[in-house]
């Protein structure tokens, strides 16, 4: 059975540069998807800034190649501005969680 993305369904957010998308990011994704069953991956628009050589389409393609075999339809990838601050007022229907990965994953 194939999964179909549903914008109304609770969704986890995964924000980053993904320069490049590596095994640590994949392991993090596998933990995050357990939260809601689908993940919105946000790629920060940082190409050409500091050590970020890859453009959005390249990063998106690499993520899709890695995730589609197991998770096709369960993630959406979007380009966002170079978000550096995440701010909130009152929490109204969402959680902010840090996913702490094992040390060997964090070293990747």
Language-model-detected regions and their locations in the chain:
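Nucleotidyltransferase catalytic core that binds NTPs
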Residues: 1-108
């Amino acid at each position: 059975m194939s999964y179909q993305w549903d914008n109304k369904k609770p969704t986890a957010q995964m924000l980053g540069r993904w320069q490049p998308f590596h095994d640590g990011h994949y392991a993090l994704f596998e933990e995050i998807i357990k939260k809601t069953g689908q993940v919105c991956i946000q790629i920060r628009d940082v190409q050409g800034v500091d050590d970020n050589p890859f453009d959005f389409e390249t990063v998106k393609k690499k993520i899709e190649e890695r995730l589609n075999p197991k998770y096709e339809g369960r993630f959406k990838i979007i380009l966002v501005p170079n978000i550096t601050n995440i701010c909130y007022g009152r929490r109204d229907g969402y959680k902010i969680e840090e996913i702490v990965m094992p040390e060997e994953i964090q070293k990747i």
